[in-house]
Amino acid sequence: MLYAFLMTTLSLLAHDDRVTNFEQMMRLPRITETDMVSFPGGKCMMYRLYLKDKDLMNTPYSVERPEEFLSSRSIERRKRQGLPVDVTDLPVAPAYLKAVSDAGIEIVGKSKWNNTLLVRIHKEKELRKLEGLDFITQTRKVFEAPDSVTQRVRSSVRKGNNDWTSDASGEYGAAKDQLKALNGEKLHANAYRGKGLMIAVFDGGFMNVDKIPALHGIHLAGIRDFVVPESKNVFAEMEHGTMVLSTMAANLPEVYIGVAPDAQYLLVRCEDERTESLAEEDYWAEAAEYADSCGVDIINSSLGYHGFDDAKMNHHYYEQDGNTALISRSASMCADKGIVCVNSAG
């Protein structure tokens, strides 16, 4: 499920009849939905493979050489907090990856923290190709493609909305009440505007971030799409990530200024809004590991999962203990790596 953490902002702005809703204020167009189309890539399934170990006797990686798989920024963050690089930081064993690929199975994702692989097949019988690979301890179906999905098309930014300017008093424009509620004005007055920090934003897309004037000055550290890795543009789908990002990164004086306009931002798509499946937890785990390797200080995630399109995948109550679901374990591990993970609960 995709939850917004914007309720505070929305309620603070609701009293102002000049801004009928947050979408209008940020000049965001509605997404155009067209006819149903076949699921991209055709009918397929994805399975999560659990691996027994990191093959420490043969792996080329070592915790003594973290610079081979972590950025200097990530290593420094650990050192600053007295946190060691451990075996969970080591990449998935290359020999295991090769064996799965050589068996004719397509690998679409991997998690070093959880020591798992995400693979895609088109027929159940293809799993037989993995028989005899003793390093695979368990398999779990995490996705089955629906017959069709709604096609979503990027809308253009409406010029009329971009011409909108705030008559709210002061530098912060329509964000004034939001900043005041968070004591942001005092922080900004003391030069705490996010400079030196890197923040990763996890969402389902960032439509038109590249076109909205208030976001033109964003300090963009990187972009990654774990749902459609070959995608050329995460700015073409889903406006929710744009809204979340704007509350932090927008910087257009007298119109809207976010709480941390001087921070660097890593934009990551790990939510597939077309479907709900356990595979999205694998995407999230990959996103967290990518953010860690880039050296982020904070992860802002607007994602959480409980019920799925296939009810057999739904999490039971006893699984909701913070230790069972793959995404929960991954979120907890962020703290082990020195990252503050903030997730919505809307």
Regions found by a protein language model. Name each.
Residues 49-53, 121-122, 142, 201-205, ...:
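Active-site-proximal beta-strand/loop segments in catalytic clefts of secreted hydrolases
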